[in-house]
Amino acid sequence: MAKLSGSIDVPLPPEVAWKHASDLSRYKDWLTIHRVWRSTLPDDIEKGTVVESIVEVKGMYNRIKWTVVRYKPPEGMTLNGDGVGGVKVKLMAKVRPADEGSTVGFDVHLGGPALFGPIGMIVAAALRSDIKQSLQNFVRVFTAPDPGTNGDGGVRH
C-alpha cells in the first residue's frame, strides 16, 4: 500500500479552514484528483455518510464509493474509498491550529490488486504531486480576496 502525506500552512483560523476542507461541494475548486460527484451530496456529513465520485490520477479514471469513517470537526475526517478493480483509497483530512492560522494536511493511502507493481509506483508518484498542487490550490482558492470564490476569505468584519 502506498502512503502519501502533505500539509500546508493556511492563514485562516482552524474553524474556517475546516469549513472549506470539509465542504465536499468545493472539492472541484481545489482537489486536483476530483472530477465529479456521482451521487447527491448530503446536507450534513457524519460518520457513515456515503458518496460516490470519479477521481483521476495520471489520466486514469476510477469511480470511488466513499464512506466517512471518522468525522471530528474541526480537526479532521477520514473517508475510505472502494473503487473499480479492487482499488482501495483512504483519504484523511486534518486541520491543526498554527502560529499564523492553521495547518491543513492530507494523507492518502492507496492499495488493491490494481496498484501492485510498477503501476502502483507510477500512480503514487503522480499522486504525490497532486497532493502538493491540491494544497497550494486550497490556499489560493480560500485565501484570495475574491468573494466570488471564498466568501470573506476568513476576514472578520
Describe the function of each predicted region.
Residues 1-46, 156-157:
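Hydrophobic ligand-binding cavity/cleft-lining segments
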Residues 6-8, 64-70, 89-97:
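Hydrophobic/aromatic beta-strand elements that line small-molecule binding cavities or substrate pockets
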Residues 15-18, 132, 136:
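Amphipathic alpha-helical segments that line or abut small-molecule/effector binding pockets
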Residues 38-85, 103, 133-157:
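Glycine-rich portal/gate segments that line the openings of hydrophobic small-molecule binding cavities
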Residues 80-133, 149-151:
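Beta-strand/loop substructures that line and gate deep hydrophobic ligand-binding cavities in soluble
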